[in-house]
């Protein structure tokens, strides 16, 4: 076999190996991408809950403290589709008592229309009422 024909055969082999490995590489890339989006949403949710808990901690005398807290959580996050029912505020509102703000945000990971995983991202923060 001459050098030229051997190199030509190896070029075809390389192409076949690439085609076999490509789906695995794409799935790994997709997984990294989806994990990044989900993690970004979790960080945004955590920051929004922290901002809402801080608002609740300083609004002890406000008549609309729960509504204000829920509104603060929703506006502090850049997550779309968050409803009032997704945010929970618990406290006795006494000076020095704890206020617990919990929020959830649904996530769904799908590949080509097939849902691989779904659930709720949940974050909770506790602050002391001032």
Regions found by a protein language model. Give the residues of each.
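Short, conserved structural patches
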Residues: 2, 51-130
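Alpha-helical assembly-interface signal, strongest on the long, hydrophobic N-terminal helix that forms
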Residues: 2-73
